[in-house]
Amino acid sequence: MASVSELACIYSALILHDDEVTVPEDKINALIKAAGVNVEPFWPGFFAKALANVNIGSLICNVGAGGPPPPAGAAPPGGPAPPPPAAPAEEKKVEAKKEEFEESDDDMGFGFFD
């Protein structure tokens, strides 16, 4: 996870980008100082240099999930899928549970008008 210093610089860069301002070191420092965050002195310069030639808008729009999609015909990692369980037995159990639930709906414990 990112440190507080890194997050402060990232948020400062995003604020500056949102205001359509370039992201130089002095403006990152000004925002961090205004927020009252203590940051090691190398972080603002590091982020300013890293973001100097980067289109931050496209960077934000192209954030991915972190990995390539699986191949189209690939089998699941656990091997072939097991056959589905017998559906009629499950339906009977569900119906029995529904009946119990419906019976308990009649008496909700509100004896105000009895």
From Swiss-Prot:
Residue ranges, annotated region (Disordered): 67-114
Alphabetized InterPro entries for the sequence:
P1/P2_N_sf, Ribosomal_P1/P2, Ribosomal_P1/P2_euk
Any idea which GO molecular function terms this record carries? protein kinase activator activity; ribonucleoprotein complex binding; structural constituent of ribosome
For bias type Pro residues, the affected ranges are: 67-87
Q: Which Pfam families match?
A: Ribosomal_60s
Q: How is it modified after translation?
A: Ubiquitinated at Lys-92 and Lys-93 by RNF14 and RNF25 in response to ribosome collisions (ribosome stalling).
Arranged from A to Z, the UniProt key words for this protein are: Acetylation, Isopeptide bond, Ribonucleoprotein, Ribosomal protein, Ubl conjugation
- GO BP: cytoplasmic translation; translational elongation
**Which positions are linked by Glycyl lysine isopeptide (Lys-Gly) (interchain with G-Cter in ubiquitin)?**
92-93
Chain intervals with Basic and acidic residues compositional bias: 89-100
Its GO CC terms are: cytosolic large ribosomal subunit
Source taxon at top rank: Eukaryota
- Where on the chain is N-acetylalanine found, per UniProt? 2
Primary role? Plays an important role in the elongation step of protein synthesis.
Oligomeric form and interacting partners: Heterodimer with RPLP2 at the lateral ribosomal stalk of the large ribosomal subunit.
Q: Which HAMAP family match?
A: Ribosomal_L12_arch
The entry sums up its family as follows: Belongs to the eukaryotic ribosomal protein P1/P2 family.
Name of the featured protein: Large ribosomal subunit protein P1
Species annotation: Sus scrofa
